[in-house]
Amino acid sequence: MLFLNAKFIDLDLGENAVIVNDEDLKGTSYYPQDRVLIESHAGAVIGNIYSTKTMVKKGEVGMLVKELKEVSISEGEEVKLRHAEKPESIPFIKKKMDGQVLNPHEIRTIIDEIVSKKLSNIELSAFVSSTYINGMNMDEISEMTKRIAETGDMISWEKSLVVDIHSIGGVPGNKYALLSIPILAAAGITIPKTSSRAITSPAGTADVMEVLTNVELKEEEIKRIVKTTNGCLAWGGGVNLAPADDIIINVERPVSIDPQPQLLASVMAKKIATGIKYTVIDIPVGKGVKIKNEAEGAKLARKFIELGELLNIKVECVLTYGGQPLGRAIGPALEAREAIEALQDPKNAPKSLIEKALSLAGILLELGGAAQIGEGQKLAWEILESGRALEKFNQIITEQGGTPKKPEEIELGEYVEEIIAPIDGYITDISNTAITNVVKEAGAPRDKKAGILLNSKIGNQVKQGDILYTIYSGSEERLVSAVNLARRVYPVKVEGMLIERISKF
């Protein structure tokens, strides 16, 4: 047992941790990464030991701000460290690593210990990896989904018909929700949209919307905003909706994986938590996204529909083209600009963005009774073209605490590099993967001003020296790294009509 004085450390390690001087660990049974119980007069919290020679002095224990708040420990207060019991879920994680099926108790225990921070990031990574490699059956996924939802807040609505649109993501520039949600809300459809931050893409819906307004809303704020406007665009993590999901996402993000069991559970847990009774799931299909072909897409769609039936949620899925970025803007600020431009002047907006936003909104307009079957997309266009969607979008921004902006008022990264066409020819490929990696290298999504603006899309003719795309960053160093990466991976490929000359057999 160790008795040490608490010292505040302004650091976020993504898990509960305590930082102990090497001298205090010598001759004890405590080692780095050991799990300990930190006790004070006000309570206790579990954390993992990290050792240091300089960050804290002998006799001190560095504690992260979240831990201090959890147990109301004051700086300088003496705390007691003792070995904590191994989490109950460790053998269950090993069981899944061996490819075995988990029972409901085992799944619920894993999720509960994720939320209570009893699992370290290493242990959580092992669980995520096990589901990525070995998968889960539908009973396991259903149980995991329900438990993820139950660990957080649950929102209920007075109206019986509450709908939602959700994309599984993977497509750079996938900003359709900033058009579809205000279209639906303007038609009187109740659609409380909560989104994750980016996992595998350079910007999630919440990241883009955060450029324009506050997205960290509490339950009562969401209810008030939806009652006033019919819709919202909020970050699910701000509402304490399915908190286990956000913890899992933080482990998935560094390695850019989104295991299908977690994907299904993440999407549907948020629907349970927000009281959604009907949802349309967008499944982008194409090179460089999560789903490579229509057969895979149809298989995933059937899983969503089956899971929805087990959870009493009506699910309809649509397969959409995901072979290149949606629109021309990739990155939070650039996407926010493009969305507002599309709301202001839809006739001159990228056709891919308009078509996707209208198609998805049209389905829910028909479901909600605002349009006859087969007439939803037409009504969606009328709402968009008339300016009603822009008006509703600005109302949502205002109600969420922001101030509506003109596109040109949204700041972009001050460090800019234009990438030009090396030859005359045609754009034959735009790699989603390469675009995503370059934009992330430029700093997105954390740097909201970072991104790429495409000048041309697949099939467009270009001449040598034409600008193919522009990279933006808020950091000169990050821009240099992004440009160097772009020159290695060629996100936009230009080829002439002559592919290869062959003169010998």
From Swiss-Prot:
Top-level taxon: Archaea
Keywords: Glycosyltransferase, Transferase
UniProt-listed InterPro entries: AMP_phosphorylase, Glycosyl_Trfase_fam3, Glycosyl_Trfase_fam3_N_dom, Glycosyl_Trfase_fam3_N_dom_sf, Nuc_phospho_transferase, PYNP-like_C_sf, PYNP_C, Pyrmidine_PPase_CS
Active site feature: 258 (proton donor)
Binding site for AMP: 170, 196-201, 205, 266, 290
SMART domains xrefs: PYNP_C
PROSITE patterns for the chain: THYMID_PHOSPHORYLASE
GO molecular function annotations of the record: 1,4-alpha-oligoglucan phosphorylase activity; AMP binding; pentosyltransferase activity
GO CC terms: cytosol
EC top class, as a word: transferase
DNA-binding as UniProt keyword: no
Pfam families reported in the protein's UniProt record: Glycos_trans_3N (PF02885), Glycos_transf_3 (PF00591), PYNP_C (PF07831)
Catalyzed reactions per annotation: AMP + phosphate = alpha-D-ribose 1,5-bisphosphate + adenine; CMP + phosphate = cytosine + alpha-D-ribose 1,5-bisphosphate; UMP + phosphate = alpha-D-ribose 1,5-bisphosphate + uracil
Enzyme Commission number, as recorded: 2.4.2.57
HAMAP family, alphabetized: AMP_phosphorylase
Annotated function: Catalyzes the conversion of AMP and phosphate to adenine and ribose 1,5-bisphosphate (R15P). Exhibits phosphorylase activity toward CMP and UMP in addition to AMP. Functions in an archaeal AMP degradation pathway, together with R15P isomerase and RubisCO.
Family, per entry: Belongs to the thymidine/pyrimidine-nucleoside phosphorylase family. Type 2 subfamily.
Protein's UniProt name: AMP phosphorylase
Organism (species): Methanococcus maripaludis (strain C6 / ATCC BAA-1332)
Classification of source organism: Archaea, Methanobacteriati, Methanobacteriota, Methanomada group, Methanococci
